[in-house]
Amino acid sequence: MKRLLVAVLFLLVVPAHAAHGSSPASIDAALAQGKRENKPVLIDFQAVWCYSCYFMASHVLNGKEWDDLNRKVVFYEADADKPADKAWMTKLNVHFLPTYLAIGPDGEELGRILAERPRDAFYREVSGILSGDARLSKQKADAAKGSLAAVADVLDTYQRRYAGKEGMAWFDTLPPMVRNVSDKDKRVALAKQRLLLLQAKDAKDDKGIVDAATKVLAGNIGCERPYVLDDLVGATESQAADARRALLAPQKAAYDTYLATQVFTPSPACADQRSAVLTAADLYAALGDTAGETAVLRKGIDLSREKLHGDLKSDRNLADNLRVYLVRAKATDELDTLEKQLIAAWPDDYVYNYRHGRRLVEGGKAAEGLPYLEAAAKKAYGANRITVATYQVKALRALSRDADAKKVVAATTAAEGKAFPEQVKKLQESLTTAS
């Protein structure tokens, strides 16, 4: 799910799907129910702005398999913008949306799935997690017996938990004999590089990112290829054009094959088409291949339109992908039309009023954008309310309506300041910073 790390928390409304019967009121309540009923708890960390969540809601979290799963678990749909759920995201080190995280009746994490999946893959992975075989404690016990497959499993689990430092620290506790032979195992070697990539990203170490990402990309990483290549593209931005091309050019052939065989096919193996397309566009742009950049974006646009058959509401994931492709392609006229259609398609949602209003304000059209932001503000709350207010303030200040801007900040501070103090502080500072 490209560029969907939780640091970018924008929007939220009514959940796209729900479990059967009455749902627990909170994660704490879900855990208590799971313990009481001796059932695992499955938490879906999502948000209404999350395009990958749209995909899962429409294509995966429904039907017989979903009904069967709900009878086996206590399900809770966590809202990334609600203070209580956000606190749990921090506690559990959840950085990616959606994340599906299972916790056993005893409180031990059973495993987690990051990002969207094709239907069959999701239910297969969930089944494995609920069996208990993916518990970190079990994996470590198996690794202690000398299983290199278990060593790789442990490292992969730390990677899914965004715990690069902890994973490498655990690896260093293994007997020297195991560590010395581990690099001969392709899975272990790849898992180690993925943890080193996490550490380099945490440290904002571009050289470390380039080194680790290049090694990871040399492995069989399936649907994660766009995300890792995106890391590499980003880490080379500061390099001279020739040096950057030398680092990125070797990735083009493998990535073109990935697009042709796993994304642009009738039955894609990888569900996240958006990340695949945007990473391709960024790669081609970095290589100076303007024609390739334009072509892959237009292919994404045309395929989205073809599958939607003129009905945006038939698939929100596809509709939102179309919007983002048009943004990236700078197709302003098409985008203006589409965003208004999206607002009409989801009238109870502040998402598209916000996106359209923000884009107008950023484009210097404060007077045109403000009404859309005001419409969004009526439906926004939590972290989203602060984000919408930020652009309301920007628009009002551009229109020399500073008194109204102060009223927006005051109202937002009163409603959300206690739950989101850092974000509200930045909002307050926006009253005096250069607009």
Tell me the role of every PLM-derived stretch.
Residues 20-25, 45-47, 60-85, 94:
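Thiol-based oxidoreductase modules, predominantly thioredoxin-like and allied folds used
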Residues 61, 94-135:
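Non-catalytic, surface beta->alpha helical segment in thiol-disulfide oxidoreductase systems
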Residues 140-143, 174-190, 215-226, 243-245, ...:
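Flexible helix-coil transition and linker loops at the boundaries of alpha-helical arrays
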Residues 151-158, 174, 192-199, 228-235, ...:
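Structural register within alpha-helical repeat arrays
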Residues 161-165, 199-203, 239, 287, ...:
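Structural motif corresponding to the intra-repeat A-B loop/turn of tetratricopeptide repeats
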Residues 275, 317, 351, 385-387:
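Start-of-helix register in tetratricopeptide repeats
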